Structures are given as structure tokens and as C-alpha cells.
Amino acid sequence: MSTLLNPYFGEFGGMYVPQILMPALRQLEEAFVSAQKDPAFQAEFTDLLKNYAGRPTALTKCRNLTEGTRTTLYLKREDLLHGGAHKTNQVLGQALLAKRMGKTEIIAETGAGQHGVASALASALLGLKCRIYMGAKDVERQSPNVFRMRLMGAEVIPVHSGSATLKDACNEALRDWSGSYEKAHYMLGTAAGPHPFPTIVREFQRMIGEETKAQILEKEGRLPDAVIACVGGGSNAIGMFADFIDETNVGLIGVEPAGHGIESGEHGAPLKHGRVGIYFGMKSPMMQTADGQIEESYSISAGLDFPSVGPQHAFLNSTGRADYVSITDDEALDAFKALSRHEGIIPALESSHALAHALKMMRENPEKEQLLVVNLSGRGDKDIFTVHDILKARGEI
């Protein structure tokens, strides 16, 4: 099928979906391309971001974490956004697109529940009926977010098949959409999946990097040495990276979850430790067995527990423009505790992975003068029970 925009990033991406979904993807691409050129759409989107979601978000300098080093560390505060994470940015854009296409229903999948909450709030705001697929395991470990979604009128559907996590929720959501796309829009939650989703999600998240660039220039008079973001599917990271890709002096660092350690096999780091395959409508690196079955991913953080990754990250990795590293559960937990204790900010476990890598860079070379920005993609309210139980079991509280 011919497309208006390039569906590939190098060899990665594409539209590997059943023929029945092609018209829906084509309609979505057409709506997106026309909306990008429509001043009225852009004005409404900008107004919602400012007056409903609370943009621009702050860029906060860490006062205490960097003590004894020559690192200057800033946090891009997506945790302050209405809804509690960066997810709100792009769902407002997609919900406006759904209305533009005349859709009345929203289908979404969610892992940590943050995208579910964002989808529910955007649907409530814009008068759309919303149903959200969520792995049964995630329903258990993210109960506050499940209640928030239901409170805002969304139907939450637990998925018991497979590993009962995000990848299974994705499969169910796609299955639903293939039978209901005439009236429903599939609100994909990350910069992955079939074209045009990776491009749409990037464009509806790119204000993260645009704001960061303007804010750091104002505060420091120069661009950062590196911007750092966690990578599951990759939407918060691509939102941060997009405006810096052409700034070749700025390092782009994506942080995948190493879970219990890469060597344990229990991780979610397909970029560095997976193989290219086709899953979830796209060609990208993924965790798979020797005979091509999708393997279970694992992370303490539900939002990073995904066996593949967005195609633009795969491309940035293949060209060397971005570096991808991994952080274990324990390292992320330590960063979670450190930021809470020393800066009075409780981060999401997802964002704690990015912070942990920044702290590692700082501690490995305390004499190095460096300016780092971490995308604090979400707040940690949803994770306090998980962390409490772990710390209690360890006798730390």
C-alpha cells in the first residue's frame, strides 16, 4: 500500500498487519497529515496541552544529588503533567484525531496503567467511549491506576492469556480494533506498532525535547552533553530525542530495563539483547526464542515490561546516533530512593532507570564537568506499594 509518509526508519518499521486494518491505518495517516497542516487543530492541541495538561513542564536542577561531583543534573518534569506522566501529551493529540475522523470510541492497551489513565482522561474530556485492555498481572500490581480509569468512565478489560502483561494486552487491543475500526480509534500508547503510529506518537511527544532545549539554553547558555530517557516502547525517549537528533554534540542515551540482570534472561532489553523480527505490526528488535516465538520480557516497572521497541530507536541504535544501555531493578530502586530522599521528588520506576544511569555516569567520573538532562517521564505514586513491599521484605523499612 502506498503511504503519504515513509513507513520505515532504515530497515525498521513498516505495516505488518492483517489486510482488514490497512484502510484504518490509511485513514489515520491522512487525518494526521492534514491535521499537522491545520492551524485550527494545532491551536486546539496547544490549548489543551497548556490549559488542561499544564505545559510547559519545569526543568528542575538537582540541588543535592550531585554533591561532591562536577556534574550538573536537570530533570525534565513530565511527572508534573496532568495524569502523572508524559503519556497525556500524545493521547490528547490522538483523541483530537479520533474526533476529526468521526470516531466515537477509543480502544487502548496499558501496562503501568499510565497510558490507560491518560486515555481515560482524554476520552472523558472529549466525550469518547473508552475501553482499555490490561494484562491481568498488571491490573493487580497497578490497582490505583485501574481505579482512576474506572472513575473516569473507562471500561478496564483484564487479559488473562499468555503472560497476562502488556504484550498480551496489545494483542487483544489489536484484535478488538480489527473488528471495530469503523467507529473506534486504537489509541496506541507508545512509539511502536505499525505505521503511522511511531511517527504520530513522536510528533505528539516532541514538545518534551523542544521545551528542554529552550529551557536549558536559558538556564545554562548551552546544550546538554547528554539527554537520558528510559526506553520500553520508547515514546518518552523519542519525545526527548527528536529535537536533539541533529545536534550531534548532544549524546542521546536510552535506558532499557535489565531486570534481574541481562545474564539471568529476565529483562526487557531487546535493542541490545534481542533479534530483529516482526511483532505488533512492525519490524524491530525483539526478545524471541531460537524458533522465533516472542519471549516474555521482565522489569520491576510495568511500563518497561515490553518485549520489543519502537522502530526509530532501532534505527538510531543501528546508526550509532543514540546509545542504549541497561539498568537493573536494584539500580532503579536505588535511584528511586535517592531522588525521593535527596530532592523530595518521587519518580516512577520507569523514570528511575534513566536517573540510575545518570547517577552512574556521575559517580564513575566525579571530576568530569558534564551537563546532563534526565527525562523524568512520570511520577511514582503508582509504584509506592510495589516499592514498599520490596523494601519491607528486605527489612529496609
Swiss-Prot record:
Q: Please provide the record's keywords in A-Z order.
A: Amino-acid biosynthesis, Aromatic amino acid biosynthesis, Lyase, Pyridoxal phosphate, Tryptophan biosynthesis
Q: Does the keyword Amino-acid biosynthesis apply?
A: yes
Q: Which cofactor does it need?
A: pyridoxal 5'-phosphate
Query: Which Pfam family is one of this chain's hits?
Result: PALP
**Oligomeric state and partners?**
Tetramer of two alpha and two beta chains.
Specify the signal sequence span: none
Q: Look at the named UniProt entry and state the broad enzyme category this protein falls under.
A: lyase
Q: Which GO terms describe its cellular component?
A: cytoplasm
**Primary role:** The beta subunit is responsible for the synthesis of L-tryptophan from indole and L-serine.
Name recorded for this polypeptide = Tryptophan synthase beta chain
Task: Give the pathway.
Answer: Amino-acid biosynthesis; L-tryptophan biosynthesis; L-tryptophan from chorismate: step 5/5
Q: Which HAMAP family match?
A: Trp_synth_beta
Q: Which organism is it from?
A: Klebsiella pneumoniae (strain 342)
Mind listing the GO molecular function terms for this protein?
Answer: tryptophan synthase activity
Q: Which PROSITE patterns match?
A: TRP_SYNTHASE_BETA
According to its UniProt record, the EC number is: 4.2.1.20
Residues recorded as bearing N6-(pyridoxal phosphate)lysine in the entry? 87
PANTHER family, alphabetized: TRYPTOPHAN SYNTHASE, TRYPTOPHAN SYNTHASE-RELATED
Cite the NCBIfam families for this sequence. Answer: trpB
Q: Which family does it belong to?
A: Belongs to the TrpB family.
State the reactions this protein catalyses: (1S,2R)-1-C-(indol-3-yl)glycerol 3-phosphate + L-serine = D-glyceraldehyde 3-phosphate + L-tryptophan + H2O
